[in-house]
Amino acid sequence: MSYGYTARLIQKNKEASDRSLGVKLGRLCIKHDLSVSEVANTLGVSRQAVYNWFTGVNTPKPPLTDLIEELISEL
């Protein structure tokens, strides 16, 4: 497991649609050992919001999508 991510979260991320920007972000964060807390602090959102994006429960809304795309390009 990466950076304290549970097997359940990793599995939900794998099962979620990779068309979602939040799911893509989750896969990269898991791969590169970037914590949910770091992502939440960088984007100014709650950790729960980030978990929901990672698992495809919710999708990030503009203007956060631009910040997320920038973060993804840096990973």
Model-assigned labels for residue ranges:
Residues 28, 42, 53:
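Residues in the recognition helix of alpha-helical DNA-binding motifs
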Residues 62-75:
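DNA major-groove recognition helix of helix-turn-helix/homeodomain DNA-binding modules
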Residues 1-5, 73-75:
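Short intrinsically disordered terminal tails
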Residues 38-40:
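Short alpha-helical "recognition helix" segments of helix-turn-helix
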Residues 6-31:
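A short, Lys/Arg-rich alpha-helix, primarily the initiator
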Residues 35, 46-49, 64:
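Short coil turns linking two alpha-helices in DNA-binding domains
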Residues 19, 61-62:
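Non-catalytic, surface-exposed connector residues within folded enzymatic/regulatory domains
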Residues 45-59:
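Recognition helix of helix-turn-helix/homeodomain-like DNA-binding domains
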